[in-house]
Every structure is written in C-alpha cells, then in structure tokens.
C-alpha cells in the first residue's frame, strides 16, 4: 500500500445486498394503512403461515430477530445452567450469545470444508461430553451461506441419544437437503 492509497476511503464490500422491490414497498404501505403496525396483525399472520408452509412445519412465530428465536428455542427446551451445547465455530455471535443467555456452555465444533459444522467432529464431541458425564440436552446447528448442514450425517444419531437439534437457519431460508427444507430438521429453528 502506498501513501496515496492510505488517503483513499475504504470501499465497502458487501457479503450480500438487500433487494427491495415494489412488492416489499407495497407490503409495508399495506401494513401501515391497515392500522396493524403493532401488535402484529394480518400481514404477520400471513407471513408466519407462509414460513411454516415453506419449511414444512406446523408452526412459525415471527420474532424481533434470529437471536430472539434461538433464545426462545433454548428456553422452551429447558436448556440452562449446567448444560453443554455443541455449536459450530463458523457462526455469527448471536448463536453462541443465545446459549450464554440461558446460562449454558457452548462447546465449539470445527467446520467442514463447506463452512457448516463437521458431522464427524460433532458426533465425536457429543460422545466425549457424554462420556465425561456432561449434560448435552441439545446441539445448535448453523446453516451458512444458503446451504444446509449435512443433517442426514448426524440427525439420526442425535435423535437416538435424545438430544434436541436446534437450527440456526437464518442464512438458509429456501435451502434443502434431499428435498427437506431448512428449518425442518430439528425441534426448533430460527430463520
């Protein structure tokens, strides 16, 4: 880098760009004109129904953030202090923050070459924690960059062990594995 380069403003490189079209603008205006900006209303009800349908699940709840969804999932499953939750190293802070919010301990598991959690390392980590007498009531799996984790490689074993699978599928809405959509592999998911 030269001195001349140091004086240039940094160009921002976005991971992804938001796409807002007339469809989204009309939906916002429709919600504002309906008088149902808060608490919720028909637009949110329709959104929840569409998400549930697309994910092939019975229920979907719109919350303020993916972090809130992960936090709520952990609380609903009774996960808290003294629990150990394996989670991918390749993630956004919200994933591990939600685990910390409930007093549980995140146990980091390295990623495979695709960026998602390494199935073999995940199962080995679970086995090691259980062998040490640790309580592992759940795992939190992160789907990255529009790709689902390799759920068929580990979900059946987790189910055998009675370990809840929680999906952080915020980056994978619309993705699937063998026709099964993101958000439908575990006991709960945040999209």
Q: Each PLM stretch: what is its role?
A:
Residues 1-37:
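N-terminal "arm"/small-domain region of PLP-dependent enzymes with the aminotransferase-like
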Residues 28, 51, 69, 85, ...:
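Generic structural signal for small/hydrophobic residues in well-ordered secondary structure
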Residues 29, 33, 48-52, 71, ...:
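Solvent-exposed, non-membrane alpha-helical residues enriched in polar/charged side chains
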Residues 37-84, 98-101, 108, 131, ...:
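Phosphate-binding glycine-rich loop
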Residues 87, 105-116:
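Short beta-strand->loop structural element characteristic of the AMP-binding/adenylate-forming
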Residues 91-96:
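Conserved coil-to-alpha-helix start sites within the AMP-binding
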Residues 114-191:
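Active-site phosphate-binding strand-loop segment of PLP-dependent enzymes
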């Amino acid at each position: 880098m030269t001195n001349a380069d140091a004086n240039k403003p940094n160009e921002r490189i976005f991971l992804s760009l938001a796409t807002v079209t007339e469809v989204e603008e009309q939906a916002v205006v429709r919600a504002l004109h309906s008088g149902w900006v808060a608490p919720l209303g028909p637009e949110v009800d329709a959104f929840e129904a569409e998400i549930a349908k697309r994910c092939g699940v019975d229920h979907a709840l719109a919350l303020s953030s993916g972090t809130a969804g992960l936090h709520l999932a952990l609380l609903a499953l009774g996960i808290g202090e003294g629990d150990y939750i394996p989670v991918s190293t390749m993630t956004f802070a919200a994933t591990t923050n939600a685990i910390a919010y409930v007093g549980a301990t995140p146990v980091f598991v390295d990623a495979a070459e695709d960026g998602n959690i390494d199935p073999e390392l995940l199962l080995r980590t679970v086995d090691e924690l259980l062998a040490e007498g640790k309580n592992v009531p759940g795992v939190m799996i992160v789907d990255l960059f529009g790709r689902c984790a390799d759920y068929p490689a580990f979900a059946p074993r987790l189910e055998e062990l009675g370990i809840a699978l929680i999906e952080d599928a915020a980056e994978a809405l619309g993705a699937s594995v063998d026709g099964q959509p993101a958000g439908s592999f575990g006991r709960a998911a945040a999209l």
